UniProtKB/Swiss-Prot annotation:
Subcellular location per the Swiss-Prot or TrEMBL entry: Cytoplasm
Family membership noted in the UniProt record: Belongs to the UvrC family.
Organism: Paramagnetospirillum magneticum (strain ATCC 700264 / AMB-1) (Magnetospirillum magneticum)
UniProt-recorded name of the protein: UvrABC system protein C
Pfam short name (any one): UvrC_RNaseH_dom
Role of this protein: The UvrABC repair system catalyzes the recognition and processing of DNA lesions. UvrC both incises the 5' and 3' sides of the lesion. The N-terminal half is responsible for the 3' incision and the C-terminal half is responsible for the 5' incision.
Gene (UniProt): uvrC
Residue ranges annotated for the UVR domain, each copy included: 215-250
Cellular compartments per GO CC: cytoplasm; excinuclease repair complex
Taxon lineage: Bacteria, Pseudomonadati, Pseudomonadota, Alphaproteobacteria, Rhodospirillales
Xref: SMART domains: GIYc, HhH1
Self-association and partners: Interacts with UvrB in an incision complex.
Length: 624
């Protein structure tokens, strides 16, 4: 590729780069990437015909200002051809999600959703809440919009199907039923108060209910209740009655719960000014599993159908779509989007904009929620902007900070020490940008808070220098708040000086003489401490940020400490890997029971040879 004319304007140079690429492009479908001079991905797009689509960028006067800026920054392009337009759409969605290009419409707050898991790696399956990678063997049901929705459903499932929720190690160690059996929340399979075939039948009923066959399950239970009543088995009939009530209670707690919709997502978009909100409601098994609001970024100047198409592609990039998606408006290239989602799901996925009935009412309800959420967001954003302007005035900054980072440490006499960083900006807390730092230094004295802060800031800003040297990726703070007084501030200033950073404002925030809130003092380099009156809104705002950093640090420390506590004495045994450890815990129920076991008992464990059993026994009984 020849270099663009260096004397031309940036926009003209970008157009020239794109024009040179257009000459080499085929008419086939594919995905293209616009790259900056540093190789950063600016934009990812897909096309039915690469040549016809990319040539449009050589006429930037017809493009939104955002895309014109992207063209001006384009120094090169990368192109991948695909067999079909559907394949191009799937690749585009995955690339946007993984790369986060600066000029694409982005779904920034796409957190993982909790699911319900029925395990399949134990003779007596367990039902539990699950979030994260699906590493455990079993069947997953969801998504649920919140942990609360999962907990509510799990409670009903326990009442209706009496399935165990305890861990495998607890299950193996039980000698008598637990409290859940007494209050009719479990059938006590741990001590075989129920036949295994009967228990597995309950598991199948729960699986059917969660798979969308709720009405069939309830109908079967009703028939069995009536049959028991006719046979004058009133105690059995009462049990079936209670199980039916538990299942109907799930639906009774829903705000909106249509009879016709078994498995669907309802997606509604509301646009006002430069703001966009997309509400997603999840319906599974005829139940409302809750909803979440999304606020796509870089959507200014885009039409609603384009935003909807971009959202659907990214939202389902790492999720299995339901059989039906109800929409408030038709996305761009709806047939291609539907085909792509169907290929991803391995079955037909229907996209529709309902015109009447329950489905239309569901979409209207979701749209009302999207409108209200966007209104609240815009009001909060205006208030947040005023607070940030107040922060700038308080600390003598030239403009309101776009990114504030707050740092705190947590430890117990130096053990399991962690550092924490939280981030806030014009849209509030940016939880996806939070970071935790396990303190690695081995030469720190216990409780050396200054040394811990130096390590945290050194790692944080050295990485920023490496990953965003030109500071155009939004990774650098305008203001860094340090939880502590003059000493912590000086430690932080020393770190930045060593790294050659002199344009990030550092402020220490310390509680008053009696460590009481409302008398905080703010420490700046070379200045006397600043105080605000106890009811000042900027003080309240900064207190909230400090408290959020403290909460995050404490939570991170507790998680690390708990992880250390659960490591049993089996971890110190030579020759005992994860598989043997699991077999021992599964057989005996606890590390203490393993330590107290005799040699014949150890030999009876699957995967433990006579030699290994003797080694384990000798380890715990060195006296013989």
């Amino acid at each position: 590729m020849t270099e663009a004319d260096s004397s031309a304007t940036p926009l003209a140079r970008g157009v020239e780069v794109i024009a040179q690429v257009v000459a080499t492009l085929p008419l086939s479908p594919g995905v293209y990437r616009m790259l900056s001079g540093k190789g950063d991905v600016l934009y990812v797009g897909k096309a039915k015909s690469l040549k016809k689509r990319v040539v449009a960028y050589t006429r930037p006067d017809r493009m939104p200002l955002r895309i014109q800026r992207m063209i001006a920054e384009t120094a090169s392009m990368e192109v991948v051809t695909t067999r079909t337009e559907v394949e191009a759409l799937l690749l585009e969605s995955n690339l946007i999600k993984s790369l986060g290009p600066r000029y694409n419409i982005l779904l920034k707050d796409d957190k993982t959703f909790p699911h319900i898991l029925i395990t399949a790696d134990h003779d007596w399956p367990q039902v539990l809440k699950h979030r994260g990678a699906r590493n455990r063997k079993g069947e997953y049901f969801g998504p649920f919009a919140s942990a609360g929705a999962v907990n509510q459903t799990l409670a009903a499932l326990q009442r209706a199907f009496l399935l165990r929720s305890c861990s495998d190690s607890v299950f193996a160690s039980r000698t008598r039923p637990c409290l859940l059996f007494q209050i009719k929340r479990c059938s006590a399979p741990c001590v075989e108060r129920i036949d295994r075939d009967e228990y597995l039948a309950l598991v199948e009923e729960a699986r059917a209910f969660l798979s969308g066959q709720s009405r069939r399950v309830q109908h079967d239970l009703t028939a069995r209740m009536e049959s028991a009543a006719e046979a004058m088995e009133y105690e059995a009939a009462a049990v079936f009655r209670d199980r039916i009530r538990a299942l109907t209670r799930i639906q009774a707690h829903q705000d909106i719960n249509p009879a016709e919709v078994e498995e669907a997502d309802v997606v509604a978009l509301h646009q006002a000014g430069d703001g966009v909100c997309i509400q997603v409601f999840f319906f599974r098994s005829g139940c409302n599993y809750g909803n979440r609001a999304y606020f796509p970024v870089h959507a200014q100047g885009e039409e609603a159908p384009q935003i909807m198409a971009a959202f659907l592609g990214q939202f389902y990039a790492d999720k299995t779509p339901p059989r039906e998606i109800l929409l408030s408006l038709e996305p761009d290239e709806v047939a291609i989007v539907a085909q792509a989602l169907s290929e991803k799901a391995g079955r037909k996925v229907t996209l529709s904009v309902p015109k009447r009935g329950d489905r239309k009412r569901l979409v209207e309800h979701a749209h009302d929620n999207a409108r209200d959420a966007l209104g609240r967001r815009m009001a909060e954003s205006g208030a947040q902007r005023k607070l940030l302007e107040g922060v700038a005035e308080l600390f003598g900054m030239e403009s309101a900070p776009e990114r504030i980072e707050v740092y705190d440490n947590s430890h117990i006499q130096g053990s399991d020490a962690v550092g924490a960083m939280i981030v806030a900006g014009p849209d509030g807390l940016m939880k996806s940008a939070y970071r935790k730092f396990n303190i690695r230094s081995t030469d720190l004295t216990p409780g050396d808070d200054f040394g811990m802060m130096r390590e945290v800031l050194t790692r944080r800003f050295a990485r920023a220098q490496k990953e965003d040297p030109d500071r155009d990726r939004g990774l650098w703070p305008d203001l860094a708040l340090i939880d502590g007084g003059r000493g912590q501030l000086n430690a932080a200033l020393g770190v930045l000086a060593e790294l050659g950073i002199d344009d990030v404002m550092l402020v220490g925030i310390a509680k008053g003489p009696d460590r009481n809130a409302g008398r905080e003092r703010f420490f700046l380099a070379g200045k006397e401490p600043i105080s605000l009156e106890s009811r000042h809104p900027v003080l309240y705002f900064l207190q909230r940020l400090r408290d959020e950093a403290h909460r995050f640090a404490i939570g991170t420390h507790r998680a690390r400490r708990s992880k250390g506590l659960v490591q049993s004495t089996l971890d110190a045994l030579p020759g005992i890997g994860p598989k043997r450890k699991k077999a021992l815990l599964h057989h005996f129920g606890s590390a203490r029971a393993v330590a107290e076991a005799g040699l014949p008992d150890l030999e009876s464990v699957e995967g433990i040879s006579h030699a290994m059993a003797k080694k384990i026994h000798d380890y715990f009984h060195p006296e013989g």
